[in-house]
């Protein structure tokens, strides 16, 4: 199958007259990622050998901390995780936290120490252990309020704030803890010394639970090296590992950027967003580890194609053309291109090529069943795009519930979450695919967050250019409330959905933690990309800086 469509046919692509063209800004990166030259094999092998030696030393220190005292071990594990190198020590961390969990409530070493108790609670919850929140009762007064004396313990307050983000439904003490710590940390941040103020401000903007591992590691390396008692071996490992993984990511991105440039959609489909780099950043947030190279490549190609499909449906295609396109998608047959307009042929052929490539890879390993799931979620995605396009052209404003039924399918979450399993190893069994496509609670909650965060930040731009109504407009019309009231209500619903996610990540889990981590990480990417604005569509300073920090600038 070839992605080449006659260049002469491009002249037949309809001009933007009477089409809802969005005028997206062009790609801001040029060819800088294409021109990346990987370091030579000898240099890379030398760095890998250094890292292996440092890993052995850190592993030895983890073992030593485990036989020392719980506080020392918890702080070392926390540093390992926040510096982004925990993937090297998964078994050691699991064994250490299992041991701590068995005696956490009876541990005298941390009696009355808010910071270490909160740290232990957070680390155990992150690992999936159902540790009771009753451990915080000792920090409340007879009326159930947190003691005022805690306010002066800034590290303890910060630890409690982070721990509260791991709460589940019914844990009122942690809801109170979040309100208590947020209020007082905001009040004190400007009066703190620089080092502590930076940590507090960072946490208030994005707690650990909602941060992307690579972005957080990049930031925390600079914080950790300023700590008076940092571990030099661990810091050296974190820096070397970050830079080595960054070089692998740059090589991957270079190959993907070359593939994207050969398709030449920027020229041939100028109405669509050209966001290959941003898409790779998004997907690297789902799994950054070197062993998931194939998963990142597959996901990046799928999100790149999905972005084009999205723009065809709400930024260019006519109702008649879109009907032809959905029929072709349902058939999933290269011969269907004959009925399509020229610009759709380009997209359709490229889409089938991407899935053909996936299919060939899966066949080599006997995992071709995965392709069926991948194709079906893509078909569902396009069906949802088509339904929304019909609403737009019919000027239909659906009820909120009607809107959400379609919008949860069009958000892309189900498509990408399911596809993220395709590029993983044998851990992604057929049973895992059956589970992820059955809309389990963690999926529906994460998808809900994805849709609402997207709509909150993108609806104003979309309504200006002519776009299907968003959740915001549907809710305002149905309930007769203001835009600000909708935002407030949606934020409450988003936070409530996070409680569902936290609950679903506690043991015993429906599927293994590595699979759940993909779904959790997708939700985290939304907080990074959509918290301030739609940073995928409108690539501003925050997105540029984030991409530079993980793909361009090495750690020194």
UniProtKB/Swiss-Prot annotation:
Binds 3 Mg(2+) ions per subunit. One of its GO terms (biological process) is diterpenoid biosynthetic process. The keyword Lyase applies. A motif (DDXXD motif) lies at residues 310-314. Pathway: Secondary metabolite biosynthesis; terpenoid biosynthesis. Residues 1-12 have a biased composition (Polar residues). Pfam families: Terpene_synth (PF01397), Terpene_synth_C (PF03936). Residues 1-24 are annotated as: Disordered. Mg(2+) 1 binds at residues 310, 314. Its cofactor is Mg(2+). Its EC number is 4.2.3.73, 4.2.3.86. Mg(2+) 3 binds at residue 462. It is an enzyme of class 4 (lyase). It catalyses: (2E,6E)-farnesyl diphosphate = (+)-valencene + diphosphate; (2E,6E)-farnesyl diphosphate = (-)-7-epi-alpha-selinene + diphosphate. Coiled coil: none annotated. Involved in the biosynthesis of valencene, a major volatile emitted from flowers of grapevine. Can use farnesyl diphosphate as substrate, but not geranyl diphosphate or geranylgeranyl diphosphate. Produces mainly (+)-valencene and (-)-7-epi-alpha-selinene along with five minor products. Belongs to the terpene synthase family. Tpsa subfamily. The Asp-Asp-Xaa-Xaa-Asp/Glu (DDXXD/E) motif is important for the catalytic activity, presumably through binding to Mg(2+). This is Valencene synthase. The gene is ValCS.
């Amino acid at each position: 199958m070839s992605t080449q469509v006659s260049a002469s046919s491009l002249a037949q692509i309809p001009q933007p007259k009477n089409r809802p063209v969005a005028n997206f800004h062009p790609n801001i990166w040029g060819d800088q990622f294409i021109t990346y030259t990987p370091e030579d094999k000898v240099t890379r092998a030398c760095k890998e050998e250094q890292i292996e030696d440092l890993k052995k030393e850190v592993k030895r220190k983890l073992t030593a901390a485990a036989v020392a005292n719980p506080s020392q071990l918890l702080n070392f594990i926390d540093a390992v995780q926040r510096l982004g190198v925990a993937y090297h020590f998964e078994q050691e961390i699991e064994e250490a936290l299992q041991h701590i969990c068995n005696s956490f409530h009876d541990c005298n070493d941390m009696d009355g120490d808010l910071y270490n108790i909160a740290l232990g609670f957070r680390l155990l919850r992150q690992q999936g252990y159902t540790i009771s929140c009753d451990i915080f009762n000792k920090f409340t007064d007879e009326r159930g309020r947190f003691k005022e004396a805690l306010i002066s313990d800034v590290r303890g307050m910060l630890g409690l704030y982070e721990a509260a983000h791991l709460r589940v439904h019914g844990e009122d003490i942690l809801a109170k803890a979040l309100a208590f710590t947020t209020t007082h940390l905001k009040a004190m941040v400007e009066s703190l010394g620089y080092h502590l103020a930076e940590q507090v401000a960072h946490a208030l903007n994005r707690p650990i639970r909602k941060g992307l591992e690579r972005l957080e590691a990049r930031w925390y390396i600079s914080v950790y090296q300023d700590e008076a008692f940092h571990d030099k071996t661990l810091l050296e490992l974190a820096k070397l590992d970050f830079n080595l993984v960054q070089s692998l990511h740059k090589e991957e991105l270079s190959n993907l950027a070359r593939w994207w440039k050969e398709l030449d959609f920027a020229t041939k489909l100028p109405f669509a967003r050209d966001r290959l780099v941003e898409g790779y950043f998004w997907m690297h947030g789902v799994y950054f580890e070197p062993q998931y190279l194939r998963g990142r490549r597959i996901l990046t190609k799928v999100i790149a194609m999905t972005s084009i499909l999205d723009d065809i449906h709400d930024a260019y295609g006519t109702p008649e053309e879109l009907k032809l396109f959905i029929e072709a998608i349902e058939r999933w047959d290269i011969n269907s291109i004959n009925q399509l307009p020229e610009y759709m042929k380009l997209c359709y052929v490229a889409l089938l090529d991407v899935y053909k490539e996936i299919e060939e890879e899966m066949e080599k390993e006997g995992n071709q069943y995965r392709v069926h799931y991948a194709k079906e979620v893509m078909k569902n995605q396009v069906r949802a795009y088509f339904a929304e396009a019909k609403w737009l052209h019919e000027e239909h404003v659906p009820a909120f519930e009607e809107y959400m039924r379609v919008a949860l399918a069009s958000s892309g979450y189900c498509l990408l979450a399911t596809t993220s399993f395709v590029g993983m190893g044998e851990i992604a069994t057929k049973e895992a695919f059956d589970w992820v496509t059955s809309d389990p609670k963690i999926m529906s909650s994460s998808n809900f967050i994805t849709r609402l965060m997207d709509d909150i930040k993108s609806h104003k731009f979309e309504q200006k250019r002519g776009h299907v109504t968003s959740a915001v407009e549907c809710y305002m019309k149905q309930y007769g409330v203001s835009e600000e009231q909708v935002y407030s209500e949606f934020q409450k619903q988003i936070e409530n959905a996070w409680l569902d996610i936290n609950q679903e990540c506690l043991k015993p889990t429906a599927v293994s933690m590595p699979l759940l981590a993909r779904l959790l990480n997708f939700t985290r990417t939304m907080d990074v990309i959509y918290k301030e604005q739609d940073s995928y569509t409108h690539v501003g300073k925050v997105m540029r800086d984030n991409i530079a920090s993980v793909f361009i600038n090495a750690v020194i």
